[in-house]
Amino acid sequence: KIVLDYKGNKGKSSIAAMNLIAQAGISLRTDDAYAIQHDKVIIADDETVQTGSFNYSSSADKRNSENAISIKHKGLAKAYNEHFLNRWSKGKEYKLSY
């Protein structure tokens, strides 16, 4: 599951990327409940959290000074998952657009 910022993903390349994600069968929602949906988190296997400033973009990978950390801790993963589910509940299901 992925939650993305609604306002920051209206450009052509963002829509193309979101369509690709949706076509792959990955659940995707857009969130406009906040000025910016700025979370950058991966929660894996209910016990590993990756977070940091890294935007999961080519620019972040090749040009910017970024950071990311992975922590294996079930309690932390649970807290991050609760935060994610809150954002998920506020999001709107993304519909493919061509």
Language-model-derived ranges and their functions:
Residues 1-5, 29-30, 42, 48-51, ...:
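Structural recognition of the beta-strand scaffold that forms the well-ordered cores
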Residues 10-15, 38-40, 60:
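Short, charged, surface-exposed secondary-structure boundary motifs
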Residues 32-34:
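Short loop/turn motifs at secondary-structure junctions and domain boundaries
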Residues 37, 44-98:
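Signature of lipid phosphatidyltransferase scaffolds
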Residues 1-27:
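Primarily the HKD phosphodiesterase
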